[in-house]
Every structure is written in structure tokens, then in C-alpha cells.
Amino acid sequence: MREEFMEELLRQAGEMTVLISSHELGEIDGVATHVAFLDEGKLLFEESMGDLTARFREVHVTTDREARPPGQLPRHWLDVKAMGNVLMFVDTRFSDDAFGEEVSSLVGGVRRIDAQPMALRSIFTTLARAARDGDEVRAARLGVRS
């Protein structure tokens, strides 16, 4: 039913701007051109879907030994954790250009780097968690308003 509603709404909207408010992020993932995230009534940020999904990646770095986060974490790495020989994090400023070099310079013994695009729901969860963790400096650099 919701899918039919969305299809009909888009068909009738034409060139109009339509504002959709939903906690079901999966429903708007392929429809929205711009998104704004609210958390507990606060605007975290707004951005075009293209820019947002281009800069967020879930990264897994496989190393030749037990993985450890670098001593000085880049501010654009969130949810950093290590399990065995894999270091995992979310990169909020992903760019193909220098990504591999940056990771290799910060994490020793890199064997493989896997960076996957993230769904809108995962991006929101990551940003909401960062904002709630109280790191106002990091949140401000990410464009999250506290």
C-alpha cells in the first residue's frame, strides 16, 4: 500500500517539491533528492542524497595481524572498532582519490580495504549515535548541529 501511495504521489507531483516526513527511511531511499535528519526535534543536517551517499562508506580493513585503531583517529571516521584482524569504521568524507593511501598510512599491515556504500538508514543511525555520544566538535565538523 505504501509503495502504491509513493508511486502515485510521485506521478502527480510532476515538478513540484514534495516534503515527506517518515521514520521509514528505506521507503524514501530511492525517491528523495534531498534529506534532512531530525533527532529528538533537532535538525542534525540537510544535504542532497547524491552528496550524502557519495561521501559515506562502511569500511573494513583487513590486516596481516590483530587490527588496532590508529592512535590519532581522523575526525571523519566514526564507529571505529576492531575484531580480530579487521578494523571497521564509517568514513564520512570518502573519496576514491586518496582513500587507500590515507588508510594504509594510518593502519599498519593492510592486506585489503573494502569500502561499501551505505543505505540511508545506516547513515542516519551512525550520525545520530555520534551526536548522542556528545562529541560536539566532531558533530560540528560532520555538519551535525547540536
Question: What is each PLM-predicted segment?
Answer:
Residues 3-94:
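ABC transporter nucleotide-binding domain
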Residues 57-135, 140-142:
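Short, charged/small-residue-rich alpha-helical element at the C-terminal edge
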